[in-house]
């Protein structure tokens, strides 16, 4: 069987805009109060072929966007613009939606509970490769079992209590 050459994926074409569009795009909510960082994360996520929701700058905005859009992945900072909490926003969201969670923060020690957590944490400053790897990992885990989702909710809940 002969396929049209434009439909054949090679290492050279794997990351072409056309091939990225053909992959299943997921909604990714960005919760970040610093506009430069939010834009950077948006560009990285978009480059992976996913749709960006947000950015949300406050806990209230994050909850509103997250509950309305029901994203597959949430990329969140810990401290937000009005002094509110990305951890609390994510914790509240996970009561209603099934989403993979990535925290990008300048204070990763706040997210250490001493236990193995099913939540990805990337310290600032980050590299493009770190964000890409985390989002790719989170989206590949999108078919996660309910057991893993419950573990993620429990982990974020523990972070909330620690805060």
Predicted regions mapped to residue ranges:
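Conserved phosphotransfer cores of two-component systems
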Residues: 67-69, 91-99, 114-116
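Acidic, metal-coordinating helix/loop segments flanking the phosphotransfer/catalytic sites
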Residues: 42, 55-73, 81
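A Lys-centered signature of the CheY-like receiver
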Residues: 124
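Non-catalytic signal-transmission and effector/linker regions of two-component phosphorelay proteins
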Residues: 1-27, 127-163
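Two-component/phosphorelay signaling modules centered on CheY-like receiver
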Residues: 34-54
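Conserved acidic carboxylate
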Residues: 32, 105
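Conserved phosphotransfer microenvironments
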Residues: 76-92
């Amino acid at each position: 069987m002969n396929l049209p050459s434009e439909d054949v994926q090679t290492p050279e074409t794997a990351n072409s805009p056309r091939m990225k569009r053909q992959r299943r795009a997921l909604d990714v909510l960005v919760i970040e109060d610093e506009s430069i960082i939010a834009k950077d994360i948006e560009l990285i996520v978009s480059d992976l072929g996913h749709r960006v929701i947000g950015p949300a700058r406050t806990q209230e905005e994050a909850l509103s966007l997250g509950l309305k859009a029901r994203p597959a992945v949430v990329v969140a900072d810990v401290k937000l613009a009005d002094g509110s909490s990305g951890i609390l926003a994510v914790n509240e969201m996970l009561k209603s939606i099934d989403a993979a969670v990535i925290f990008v923060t300048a204070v990763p020690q706040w997210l250490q509970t001493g236990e193995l957590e099913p939540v990805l944490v990337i310290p600032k400053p980050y590299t493009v490769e770190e964000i890409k790897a985390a989002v790719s990992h989170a989206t590949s885990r999108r078919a996660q079992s309910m057991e893993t989702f419950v573990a993620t909710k429990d982990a974020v809940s523990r972070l909330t209590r620690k805060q």
